[in-house]
Amino acid sequence: KGFVAKQDYASAENSLKQAIAQSQDDILTSLAALRLSAVQFQQGQFDAALASLNQVKSQGFSARKDLLAGDIQVAKGDVNGAKASFENAQKSGNPLEKQMAQMKLNNL
């Protein structure tokens, strides 16, 4: 978080990749992968950001994963992919995530 706050995205990316490589815990790995994907998205590395989301294994993060994937796909111009991701988030998310997914679907 500190590197992102300082807009040192390269250091943030390296730290998160290291955390993913060293973690034996699916929840920690999933959280680090979500943050890594967000950092890569921030830098315009859309394909890398989508690839990082493949490391999210914990089911508890599936809606957050789908919401972020949808945002990345929108930025890439993949409206159909974004729609599918947001619809998946609606199926697996908590009430707030479902509402957010619906808002994003409405904005497509």
Spell out what each predicted region is.
Residues 1-63, 69-72:
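Alpha-helical adaptor scaffolds
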Residues 57-59, 73-96, 106:
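TPR/TPR-like (Sel1-like) alpha-helical repeat modules
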